[in-house]
Amino acid sequence: MKTFLVYNTSFFGDMILTNPLCRQLKRVYPHSHLVFISDKTYADVARYMDGVDEVWIYDKHKKHKGIIGFYNFYKEHKNAYSFDAAFIIYGNERGIFLSKLLGAKKIYADSTHKYVHRLLDNPPINYGKWYQIQDQNTYLAELYTQVPTESLPMKYHVPEEAFAYVDSILLKDIHKPIVALNPITKNKEKDLKRPRLFI
């Protein structure tokens, strides 16, 4: 069984844009185990994404802040798995070093840093036709699997307690709620086109 590590300690939207990568890995390796390293604030975002089996919380602002915090995180997880590959979103140097220390056999990231790039198993990336961030994230899987990237929609498993919260608090005394989505961001590469919205 393959075991993968996905590292993204960015913000809410960035986490969601990583989901197609997780889904692509599961599409190619359906029986694999995928560990997602997330910042504490957005751990629930990762926890309920399709394709994610386990979430490790990297509390970069408190518990795991700085070099000592980095080392403590490593000690907490150092013998948990033997990772076949790690996928580091946005070429995060901390994620690359951590993946190496955790023993990932292959590491894929988009980093142009001269010294850090030596730790990667991919050459500088040419995304070709992939210009949207979620597709570029997914392309990292192709570098490992050699299976062509498929532009997958994001899929999120909303927990039942979230529905209960919305019903009891947010929709209290509202008989006909309206839900609006705003798929537009300040960066065109992150905008969600109609078929790319959650399914």
What is each PLM-predicted segment?
Residues 1-199:
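Catalytic machinery of carbohydrate-active enzymes
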